[in-house]
A protein has these predicted regions:
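Non-catalytic helical/linker scaffolds that mediate oligomerization, partner binding
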Residues: 1-465
Length: 465
């Protein structure tokens, strides 16, 4: 079974029911709805289609809502766009003006309070670079080019004082709660307080069971938010704008390692198979990029425009599956396990999960079976990246879907039993019925006793099917 999960962005190219069905059958694990684009009507139709088709195909495909985030953008130009020339002055203003070659309004009217003379300002994913020369954001153009309406503005190494949750994001998140999404991907996270604020909003409005994936997009976000997030998305597009491009691969590897060793999920995203937006095959460089993320141990790899707006969405999923499966065959899981740097003082769940993986490795077990209420034990087992398949039996569909993002985990739903051994037998039978196990397979089971208490993982059982 493939260990690395695949996140696919929905869009016009996936609005055909048969296309989306094929994407699920080929290996899509998570459907991403990008709320930087589209209407609520668009997103609801797509979410409803996912819910309908995942029942039909019998796959626990999760839904991820990706917020727009607290972005700064230029507003409108009189002619729709302008050409900025190297060396000229250009002003970003809080005043409402019709944009010209000399001046344009920005969406955040207090931006000038956060900037100082000498700071860099980047427009349109860094294609246009300017430097502040006066306090009212008069900039000298370093690299010129075309700027059109609503292009993004980035200020590297500056913690902007704008509110983290915008009015739009708040409404989008409340909509997501209504639609029973499984994950919120929080954009432009700079500090852990941003996530605590988001979690408070979820808890206040009945979304406490939604997992938060923090998108790391600048230098401030790398160090301080893993502990309060349920997962991390390495958003290499915006990261490449604010961090020197030669640093992106180094930071990507460090983030992946840090996050999965903390027992959390990590998604590697942006431009993974971008040429497949227009072409049926990837470049060799893209193939290597996907494979390197798999070698690094990423939980998931993500398709954006390739599936949302591309000509070959199903082929893009097939391609990712082929690359991931082939790369996983080459990974030395035993070596990776023994090189794992553990916490000095693990809790009981962590210690039991480590012992489970050790036992599975020693016995060359076909599978590790976790019986879980919250999904934590499955994620902790996953963090050790064992060679054995991880079959996780959850007692709710929500937890089952959320485990679809966890590396190496094949999630199933089973009804809760009060008797532990009856529950273990039910888990084995469910896995056998799905074809994940067969007679004679050796399994290592881990769970908590008493049954049904979240966070009580405390036992290991070796069982032959």
């Amino acid at each position: 079974m493939r260990k690395t999960k695949i996140v696919c962005t929905l869009g016009p190219s996936t609005d055909n029911e048969e296309v989306l069905r094929q994407m699920m059958l080929e290996g899509m694990n998570v459907a991403r709805c990008n709320f930087s684009h589209g209407t609520y009507e668009d997103h609801k139709k797509r979410m409803d289609m996912v819910k309908k088709l995942r029942k039909e195909v019998g796959r626990p495909v999760a839904i991820l809502l990706d917020t727009k985030g607290p972005e700064v953008r230029v507003k409108n130009f009189k002619e729709g766009k302008v050409i900025l020339e190297e060396g000229q002055l250009f002003t970003l203003t809080a005043d409402e003006v019709e944009g010209t070659k000399d001046k344009v309004s920005v969406t955040y009217n207090r931006l000038y309070e956060d900037l100082e003379v000498g700071m860099r300002v980047l427009i349109d994913d860094g294609l246009i670079e300017m430097k502040v020369e006066k306090n009212d954001i008069v900039c000298r153009v370093i690299n010129g080019g075309v700027v059109s309406n609503h292009k993004g503005v980035n200020v590297p190494d500056v913690d902007l004082s704008m509110p983290y949750i915008s009015d739009k994001d708040r409404e989008d998140i409340l909509f997501g709660i209504e639609q029973d999404v499984d994950f919120i991907a929080a954009s432009f996270v700079q500090k852990k307080e941003d996530i605590l604020q988001l979690r408070k909003l979820l808890e206040k409005n009945g979304g406490e069971d939604i997992k938060i994936i923090s998108k790391i997009e600048n230098a401030q976000g790398v160090a301080n938010i893993v502990e309060v997030s349920d997962g991390i998305m390495v958003a290499r597009g915006d990261m490449g704008v604010e961090i020197p491009y030669e640093e992106v691969p180094v930071i990507q590897k460090k983030i992946i390692k840090k996050v999965y060793r903390a027992g959390k999920q990590v998604i590697t995203a942006t431009q993974m198979l971008e040429s497949m937006i227009k072409n049926p095959r990837p470049t060799r460089a893209e193939t290597t990029d996907v494979a390197n993320a798999v070698y690094d141990g990423t939980s998931a790899i993500m398709l954006s425009g390739e599936t949302a707006a591309g000509s070959y969405p199903v082929e893009a999923v097939k391609t990712m599956v082929r690359i991931a499966e082939r790369t996983e065959q080459d990974v030395d899981y035993r070596k990776r396990f023994f090189l794992f740097e553990r916490e000095a003082n693990p809790d009981i769940t962590d210690a039991i999960c480590h012992a489970t993986c050790t036992t599975a490795l020693d016995l060359n077990a076909t599978a590790i079976v976790t019986v879980t209420k919250s999904g934590r034990s499955a994620r902790m087992v996953s963090s050790y990246r064992p060679k054995s398949d991880i079959i996780s039996c959850a007692t709710t569909e929500k937890v089952c879907r959320q485990l679809s993002l966890a590396w190496g985990v094949t999630p199933l739903v089973i009804k809760e039993e009060k008797d532990a051994y009856a529950l273990f037998d039910k888990a084995i039978m469910a896995a056998e019925k799905k074809g994940f196990l067969k007679k004679g397979d050796l399994t290592v089971i881990t769970s908590g006793v008493p049954i049904g208490c979240s966070g009580t993982t405390n036992m290991i059982k070796v069982q032959i099917v």
